[in-house]
Amino acid sequence: MHLLDLDVLSREDVLKIIEYGIYFKKNRRKHEKILEGKSVAILFEKPSTRTRMSFDIAVYELGGHPLIMNQNEIHLGKKESIKDTAKVMGRYVDTIVARVYKHRHLEEMAKYSSVPVINALSDLAHPCQILADLMTIKEYKGKFKGLKIAYLGDGNNVCNSLILGSALVGMDTYVGTPKGYEPNAKVVLKAKEIINNYGEGSLTLTNDPIEAAEDADVLYTDVWISMGDDKDKEEVLKIFPPFQINSKLLEYAKDDVIVMHCLPANRGYEITDDVIDGEHSVVYDEAENRLHVQKGVFKFIFERK
């Protein structure tokens, strides 16, 4: 199977991957080598720190061989067609992990690849990040049902995957964005379908940051302008400040709220220093959990291959 976004998973699948992630975290030096004898191509059109390190180390600690290629070594759809790249790589490696600019490139790669393709980030989705986020919420809150999670800022790829992941585990999700910066409309429809299918959770889009943050158990934000984004910086800096997670906004959330950011953070913009470094912040646990939950993704995929 391919993991291009979370809508290919069921609730049971998501909970199983989280369970695997928690297991790998508790048994980091003692767990089984499920990738022994296997090679994993890790492709980066977009530079990365956490994604590259976490996937590289995950493959290594699972006994596999990570083959990392950066933007200067791969030319998806340029010097060679994506079809040819995918077909050839499928004969060399056991899995392809790709961080790309265009989600459609991933879809084409998955169409022609004979091995699983895992989305390590695209302009539409960031599923592995959200699996790590859900694992972090599970660690801190012990549950999903009945929790309110509020995302504030730009309705970007992280936001898209977050509303799918939150829908799958039954949380009540509020997305607070400026007008015109809402998450992808098709993803919103998918999330609402998931909520209707399970009969749990909810999804509310609002342009009011206080409505989003009020009584929240989890506050989440991301950068206002993503890498490769063509947003007008002056416009963003004019209309996004009310959606900043700061001490004032924190007062509207629950006393035991946790604050999340997928990093890297532009401190002083989408989140203030005192909040990201404060007692409610779980950003470093969240970042660490990328490593563990991605091991869980490999285990899940190879069990079903």
Curated annotation (Swiss-Prot):
Alphabetical UniProt keywords: Amino-acid biosynthesis, Arginine biosynthesis, Cytoplasm, Transferase
Pathway: Amino-acid biosynthesis; L-arginine biosynthesis; L-arginine from L-ornithine and carbamoyl phosphate: step 1/3
InterPro entries in the record: Asp/Orn_carbamoyltranf_P-bd, Asp/Orn_carbamoylTrfase, Asp/Orn_carbamoylTrfase_sf, Asp_carbamoyltransf_Asp/Orn-bd, Orn/put_carbamltrans, OTCase_ArgI
Binding positions for carbamoyl phosphate per the UniProt entry: S48, T49, R50, T51, R99, H126, P127, C128, Q129, C262, L263, R290
Enzyme class: transferase
One family name in Pfam for this protein: OTCace
GO cellular component: cytoplasm
Catalytic activity, reaction form: carbamoyl phosphate + L-ornithine = L-citrulline + phosphate + H(+)
GO molecular function: amino acid binding; ornithine carbamoyltransferase activity
Subcellular location: Cytoplasm
Superkingdom, natural source: Archaea
Biological process per Gene Ontology, one example term: L-arginine biosynthetic process
Main subcellular location: cytoplasm
PROSITE patterns, sorted: CARBAMOYLTRANSFERASE
Record-linked SUPFAM superfamilies: Aspartate/ornithine carbamoyltransferase
EC number: 2.1.3.3
Role noted for this protein: Reversibly catalyzes the transfer of the carbamoyl group from carbamoyl phosphate (CP) to the N(epsilon) atom of ornithine (ORN) to produce L-citrulline.
Matches recorded under NCBIfam families: orni_carb_tr, PRK00779.1
Family under the similarity heading: Belongs to the aspartate/ornithine carbamoyltransferase superfamily. OTCase family.
Name used for this protein in its record: Ornithine carbamoyltransferase
Gene: argF
